[in-house]
Amino acid sequence: MTIKTPTVKVPGLGTDPLEQRIKEKEKKWKYKIAVLSGKGGVGKSTVAVNLTAALAKMGYFVGILDADIHGPNVAKMLGVDKEEVYAEKFDDGHFEMIPPTTDFMGQVTPIKVMSMGMMVPEDQPVIWRGPLVTKAIKQLLGDVKWGSLDFMIIDFPPGTGDEILTVVQSIKLDAAIIVTTPQEVALLDTGKAVNMMKKMEVPYVAVVENMSYLICPHCGNKIDIFGEGGGEKLAQKEGVDFLGKIPIDLKAREASDLGIPIVLYEDTPAAKAFMELAEKLVNKLKEIKGDGGKE
C-alpha cells in the first residue's frame, strides 16, 4: 500500500477515536444496506456488486465495503483489484485510506470501493482470529474517506458470524438483503440469516433468490435447475419481503472475470432483473423514510 501524508486537522475525539470516526462518517451515509447469505455459493457478492452498480447507474452515489476479510472478491469483480490504495495522515496520527473509484468509462456514477483484496496479494491468505477481523472491519468503516453517500453497501461473508455483529454494533443498518438459491439446503440457512437480522432490529429485511432459473439460449424456454419458488415461500414464511429472482446468465461468468458487473450488459436477463431489484429497493426505502433516497 502506498501512503501519502498531508496533515489534516480533526475535531477532538472521545475515548475511542475509531468508534467516534465511524459515527461521524455514518452521518453522511443516507442508507446502509447489508448483503448477506446463510451459506456460501449462492452468489451473494454477485448480488452485492450488481446492486451497487445498478444504483450507481440510476445516478446515486454508492460505496461498497467488502467485509469478507478472509475471502475478499468485490474489488476483482469491480475491476479495481490492481488499484493502489493511498492514505492521508491526520494530525492525531491516524491514517485514512482513499477508496479507489470506478465509473466504467462514464456508464455509472463513480463507485467507491474498499476491500482487503486491494491490500494483500491475491494468493496470500489472511489468517486472522476474531479480534483482528473485528478491528479490520472497524477500520474499513472508520479509517476510509468515504465522504457523502446515498448508499453504503456492505458485502458480508457467508453465515452469521463476528463480521455481521461488528457492523451492526457499529452502525445502524437501514436494510438487509438476504441472498439465497432455490435449493432446500440454502433455504434452511437463509432462514437463520433472516431471523438474525430481525433479532438485530434491522428496519427492512428482504430475500433475493439468485440463480433462480436459466433461459435456454437455443429454444428460449425457462429451466428451473435448482427448483422453483423456494425463496418466495421462505420470505412469506418469515414475514419479510421478496425482492425478486435473478436468473442464471451465461454472460455473468465472463463479466465477472473481466471485472464488469453483469448489470452493464443491458440486454441480458440478469441485467434487467438487477435493475428491477434496485428500483424496488429504492422505492421501499423511499416508502419507509418518506423520500427518494437521493441527496
Swiss-Prot record:
What is stated as this protein's family in its record? Belongs to the Mrp/NBP35 ATP-binding proteins family.
PANTHER family reported for this sequence:
IRON-SULFUR PROTEIN NUBPL
Q: Keywords, A to Z?
A: ATP-binding, Hydrolase, Iron, Iron-sulfur, Metal-binding, Nucleotide-binding
The record ties this protein, via InterPro entries, to: Mrp-like_CS (IPR000808), Mrp/NBP35_ATP-bd (IPR019591), NUBPL-like (IPR044304), P-loop_NTPase (IPR027417), YlxH/NBP35 (IPR033756)
* Record-given protein name: Iron-sulfur cluster carrier protein
- Where is ATP annotated to bind? G38, K39, G40, G41, V42, G43, K44, S45
Show the Gene3D superfamilies listed in the entry.
P-loop containing nucleotide triphosphate hydrolases
Q: Which domain of life is it from?
A: Archaea
GO MF term set: 4 iron, 4 sulfur cluster binding; ATP binding; ATP hydrolysis activity; ATP-dependent FeS chaperone activity; metal ion binding
Q: What subunit structure does UniProt give? A: Homodimer.
Q: Which GO terms describe its biological process?
A: iron-sulfur cluster assembly
**What is the stated purpose of this protein?**
Binds and transfers iron-sulfur (Fe-S) clusters to target apoproteins. Can hydrolyze ATP.
What's the source species for this entry?
Answer: Pyrococcus horikoshii (strain ATCC 700860 / DSM 12428 / JCM 9974 / NBRC 100139 / OT-3)
Q: Which Pfam families match?
A: ParA (PF10609)
